Amino acid sequence: MRFRSLISLLFLLFFTSSAYARFVSLNPSSTSLISDGIDGGSNLAGSGSVIKSVVSAPAEEKEEACEQTYGFMPCTKTALGNVFLILVYGFLMFTAATYLSAGSELLLEILGPGIVGGLFLPMLGALPDAMLIMVSGLSGDAATAQSQVSVGMGLLAGSTVMLLTVIWGTCTVVGKCDLRDSIAVNNQDTKGFHLKDSGVTVDIWTSYAARIMAISVIPFVIVQLPQMLGSTSGRQLSVLIALILSVLMLISYCVYQVFQPWIQRRRLAFAKHKHVISGILRHLKQHALGRLLDDEGQPDEHVIRKLFLTIDANNDGHLSAAELKALIIGISFEDIDFDKDDAVGKVLQDFDKTLDEQVDQEEFVRGIKQWLIQAMGGAPSGPEAGPRTMKFLDNFHVQTKREHALLGDNENGENDEEGGEVADPKWITIKAALLLLLGAAIAAAFADPLVDTVNNFSAATGIPSFFISFIALPLATNSSEAVSAIIFASRKKIRTASLTFSELCGGVTMNNILCLSVFLAIVYVRGLTWNFSSEVLVILIVCLVMGGFASFRTTYPLWTCFIAYLLYPFSLGLVYILDYWFGWS
């Protein structure tokens, strides 16, 4: 049904064209009628003159005709007509983004993450924005491109600001859960809109994504340096340097995305191993009555040797893999799921220095001492650090549990990204390819008409095209991503919240490097003037505020949504004041 509606809309658009008319007066006294010299009031003579006046329309009215994109797309000079066309073209761009998103998800089901998830999906997500930015600077001669390129900058700034303010704040509100020990409790939302005791928690990878997003604004700073220094020379050079850097950052980001699943698995395996260490030490503490440390705060070898004897079930002086596995199975790890055999292998790797697949008493003592020193970390040592300071083991346990949770391990084997085994890979691949091609074709076909319509609406209303593209165009190109992010966040889990905010940071990062690369390439190749100081300042402020905030914390209390929401009107007001009060543009 949706596809038929799209075809019908395209059909109407293609067979619609602009039309112009003149008001014709039949009043014989009209000055537009030419007398025949016999009867000035003759209706017949007047009618003949009317025909002549209609046939020979004035030249200035012909010049007022709007220019049709591609020579056949509809256009109009009226404000309401352009509003209608903006809605139509915006819907088509939204449809293109939806098709690209659906095709990307299907492709991800077939090929999995890695190259597809790290290389193609981020680029496909930014494709509609990149198309609009590209056509805004390629239309007409250099003077026309210079006047239209503000549409591309408005879209670039508007998309970044909308994702990090309105969408970010909304995801915080719909995804909030109760906070316990500064960590959100999955699927528990009993405290309503309490500003401090409810919020969302994300994994550590979201913090990394936020840091990358903050770093991605460096090309903006470089291209803005000549204006900051008050220099008129070197502007083209700064554009070229920023272009090269943004392309290099794009390549680096894609490589990082490709290898991130492998990095994440390594980090998660290390966190699980630390959790096993914590569990074994707490278990030994209980059996040693809390005397793992002597009066000097050092590991007590005598107690550790006694513990070895209690674990050595067959009294052969060695701990085999089976005995270590029995020890691990007997310890409660609070629903942390991990491979017991893998855990035994890592314990052997820490203890077994002779590589004989078993642990003797000396190796056990040496290994436990190293674990205790690792767990003590910054705990006090010396005479005052006796058995009473064994609380450091509990602190170490809390720390390892938190690290494990923040690394985003799937609870109970759950995976929110995978829907199971694909039934018909061949058909899914064909469907994904068709959706991607259709989405790319729609975006390419209607990007130019949308830019022209925005400029026509700006001319008809006197509203700067930047503000129109800043507010309206991101709604068209990012609506699909925004809706899916909000729906995903509403599942109220740490994992889904992490994926949601990581996607928001990733989308902004692609805007800052991919879309900016396209924009800078157009400015450099066509020799356009870079004059977007206020817009760059807004992007820097929003990215650094939200990126800095998300870089150093993994829990967002509900009150933080107000910061995000307030940044949107602040950004609009700042651009207006700088451009029209201080004349920055």
UniProtKB/Swiss-Prot annotation:
| Membrane topology annotation | Multi-pass membrane protein
> What parts of the sequence cross the membrane?
83-103, 106-126, 149-169, 212-232, 239-259, 427-447, 457-477, 505-525, 532-552, 558-578
Q: Extract the GO molecular function terms from the UniProt entry.
A: calcium ion binding; calcium:sodium antiporter activity; mRNA binding
Distribution of this protein across tissues and organs: Expressed in roots, leaves, stems, petals, stamens, ovules and siliques.
The entry's Ca(2+) 2-binding residues are: 352, 356, 358, 363
Disruption of the gene: reported phenotype: No visible phenotype under normal growth conditions. No visible phenotype under short day (SD) conditions, but early flowering under long day (LD) conditions.
Compartment list = Cell membrane; Vacuole membrane
Identify the glycosylated residues: 478
Q: Does the keyword Ion transport apply?
A: yes
Q: Which GO terms describe its biological process?
A: calcium ion homeostasis; cellular response to salt stress
- What range(s) does the EF-hand domain occupy? 299-334, 339-374
> Where does the UniProt annotation place the signal sequence?
none
Quick one: where is this thing mainly located? membrane
Q: What induces it?
A: Induced by salt stress. Induced by cold stress, heat shock and abscisic acid (ABA). Induced by calcium and magnesium chloride, and osmotic shock.
- Coiled-coil ranges (or none): none
Q: Which GO terms describe its cellular component?
A: membrane; plant-type vacuole; plasma membrane; plasmodesma; vacuolar membrane; vacuole
Reading the lineage from the top rank, the first entry is: Eukaryota
- The entry's keywords: Antiport, Calcium, Calcium transport, Cell membrane, Glycoprotein, Ion transport, Membrane, Metal-binding, Repeat, Sodium, Sodium transport, Stress response, Transmembrane, Transmembrane helix, Transport, Vacuole
Q: List the disulfide bonds.
A: none
Q: Which residues bind Ca(2+) 1?
A: 312, 314, 316, 318, 323
UniProt-listed PANTHER family: SODIUM_CALCIUM EXCHANGER MEMBRANE REGION DOMAIN-CONTAINING PROTEIN, VACUOLAR CALCIUM ION TRANSPORTER
**Family that this chain belongs to:** Belongs to the Ca(2+):cation antiporter (CaCA) (TC 2.A.19) family.
Q: What does this protein do?
A: Possesses sodium/calcium exchanger (NCX) activity when expressed in a heterologous mammalian CHO-K1 cell system. Does not possess cation/proton exchanger (CAX) or sodium/proton (NHX) activity when expressed in a heterologous yeast cell system. Has the ability to bind calcium in vitro. Participates in the maintenance of calcium homeostasis. May play a role in auxin response, diurnal rhythm and flowering time. Involved in salt stress response.
Name listed for the protein in its UniProt record: Sodium/calcium exchanger NCL
Origin species? Arabidopsis thaliana
